[in-house]
Curated annotation (Swiss-Prot):
InterPro entries xrefs: SMIM19
Transmembrane segments: 25-43
UniProt keyword terms in alphabetical order: Membrane, Transmembrane, Transmembrane helix
Membrane topology classification: Single-pass membrane protein
Compartments it resides in: Membrane
KW Membrane (keyword) present: yes
Family under the similarity heading: Belongs to the SMIM19 family.
Keyword Chloroplast in annotation: no
GO cellular component assignments: membrane
Name the record gives this protein: Small integral membrane protein 19
Organism name: Xenopus tropicalis
Chief place where the protein resides: membrane
């Protein structure tokens, strides 16, 4: 098994470079896992701060559009109420005329 997969050197000694590389890789993975857990815990505690960073403040155009649509709804509601009162007024006039006759 001379020189097979870098485990044994030609002189019969064990090559530890694979083990060292494995140890370094696992250390890196452990650090990444610990940092990600820490970031996850921080994110859970400070969710609102983080979301405030990513939310876009409303522009002036959207505010005016919303006001425009609110105004249109109010105008339409006012028109409907006026039509309702006019209809009720005519119904009352008809009922009064019937009772008088």
């Amino acid at each position: 098994m001379a020189g097979g997969y870098g485990v044994m050197a030609d002189d019969g000694t064990i090559d530890y470079s694979v083990h060292e590389a494995w140890n370094e890789a696992t250390n890196v993975y452990l650090i990444v896992i610990l940092v990600s857990i820490g970031l996850f815990m921080y994110a859970r505690k400070n969710k609102r701060k983080i979301m405030r960073i990513f939310t876009v403040p409303p522009t002036a155009e959207s505010a005016t559009e919303a006001n425009f649509y609110d105004d249109m709804k109010k105008i339409r509601l006012r028109q409907q109420l006026e039509m309702y009162y006019i209809a009720r007024k005519h119904e009352q006039n008809d009922s009064i005329q019937l009772t008088v006759e």
